[in-house]
C-alpha cells in the first residue's frame, strides 16, 4: 500500500481536486455501497484537506456530515482552489436542486435555505466569470495543449497500473474535467466535432498499439481487462471505481464495466470489441454527459 493515495494512484491525476469538491457537495453516495469504497472516500478526503492545510476539518464522517457543514467546507475549498468550469457548474446545478427541496428536517440549521441560496448565487457568478475568461483565452488552443499533455503521459506509461480500457477511461475523463472539456462545453458545434474526432482517432490508435493489433481487430473483453503491466487491485481499483462512480450499467455500460470491476460486466458491454469500438463507446458515454 502506498503511503498516501495522492502520492500513489492520484499522483498522475489532475481531476482529483475538482471531482472531490463535487463529491463533497453531493454528500453520501449510495452508488458506492461497499465498506472499502466508503473508506477510500474518507481517506481521500482527509489527504486532500491535509494538503490544503485544513486538518481541523478532517474528522471522520465529513462526507456524511450535516448539509450546512459540508456546504461551508465546499465554499472554503472553492475559495482556496480553482475547481474549474465543470466542477463549478455541477455544484451550482446541485445547489439549484437543493433550493427546491424541503429542509425543515434540518431544524438544527434554521439558516440552511439562506445559505443554499447565497452559495447558489456565488457559484453561479463564478461560473459566468469562468466562462467569460475561458472564451477569451482561445479554447481550441488550450484544448489541444491539454490533449497533447495527457496523451504524452499515456505514451510514457503514467497510467500503466490500470488495464488498457482503464487507461483510456482515465485519459478521456482527465480531458473532460480540463481545458479540453471546457472547449467541448463552450465551443461551437463545428469545433466540438473537430475536437472529438481527433480525440477518437488518438484514443483508438493508442489502444490498438498497446495491444499490438489493428484498430478494428476484435478481442474478448477479458483480454482487454487483463492488459495491465502491474496488478490492478487495491488502491488503483478503488480510484478507478471512484472516478467512474457517475456511470450506470444501463446508460454507460462500457464505462461502468471498465470502472466498476467489483461488479459483473453490464449487459451492454460488448463481449468482443476492437480498439475502435471500445474507444468510441467510452468517448460517446463520457462526452454525452459532458455536453448535457
UniProtKB/Swiss-Prot annotation:
Domain of life: Bacteria
Stated name of the protein: Uncharacterized protein YjcZ
InterPro entries in the record: YjcZ
Record organism: Escherichia coli (strain K12)
Any single GO BP term: regulation of single-species biofilm formation on inanimate substrate
Gene of this entry: yjcZ
Amino acid at each position: 500500500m502506498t503511503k498516501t493515495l495522492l502520492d500513489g494512484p492520484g499522483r498522475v491525476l489532475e481531476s482529483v481536486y475538482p471531482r472531490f469538491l463535487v463529491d463533497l457537495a453531493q454528500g453520501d453516495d449510495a452508488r458506492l455501497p461497499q465498506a472499502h469504497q466508503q473508506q477510500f472516500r474518507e481517506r481521500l478526503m482527509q489527504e486532500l484537506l491535509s494538503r490544503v492545510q485544513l486538518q481541523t476539518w478532517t474528522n471522520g464522517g465529513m462526507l456524511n456530515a450535516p448539509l450546512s457543514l459540508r456546504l461551508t467546507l465546499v465554499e472554503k475549498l472553492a475559495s482556496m482552489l480553482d475547481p474549474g468550469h465543470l466542477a463549478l457548474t455541477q455544484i451550482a446545478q446541485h445547489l439549484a436542486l437543493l433550493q427546491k427541496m424541503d429542509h425543515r428536517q434540518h431544524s438544527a440549521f434554521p439558516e440552511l435555505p439562506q445559505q443554499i441560496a447565497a452559495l447558489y448565487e456565488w457559484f453561479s457568478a463564478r461560473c459566468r466569470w469562468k466562462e467569460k475568461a475561458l472564451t477569451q483565452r482561445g479554447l481550441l488552443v488550450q484544448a489541444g495543449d491539454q490533449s497533447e499533455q495527457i496523451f504524452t503521459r499515456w505514451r510514457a506509461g503514467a497510467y500503466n497500473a490500470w488495464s488498457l480500457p482503464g487507461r483510456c477511461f482515465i485519459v478521456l475523463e482527465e480531458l473532460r474535467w480540463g481545458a479540453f472539456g471546457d472547449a467541448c462545453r463552450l465551443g461551437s458545434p463545428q469545433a466540438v466535432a473537430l475536437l472529438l474526432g481527433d480525440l477518437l482517432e488518438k484514443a483508438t490508435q493508442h489502444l490498438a498499439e498497446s495491444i499490438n493489433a489493428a484498430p478494428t481487430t476484435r478481442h474478448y473483453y477479458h483480454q482487454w481487462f487483463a492488459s495491465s503491466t502491474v496488478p490492478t487491485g487495491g488502491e488503483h481499483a478503488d480510484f478507478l471505481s471512484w472516478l467512474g462512480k457517475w456511470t450506470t450499467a444501463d446508460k454507460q455500460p462500457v464505462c461502468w464495466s471498465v470502472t466498476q470491476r467489483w461488479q459483473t460486466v453490464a449487459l451492454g458491454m460488448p463481449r468482443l470489441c476492437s480498439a475502435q469500438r471500445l474507444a468510441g463507446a467510452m468517448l460517446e458515454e463520457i462526452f454525452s454527459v459532458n455536453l448535457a
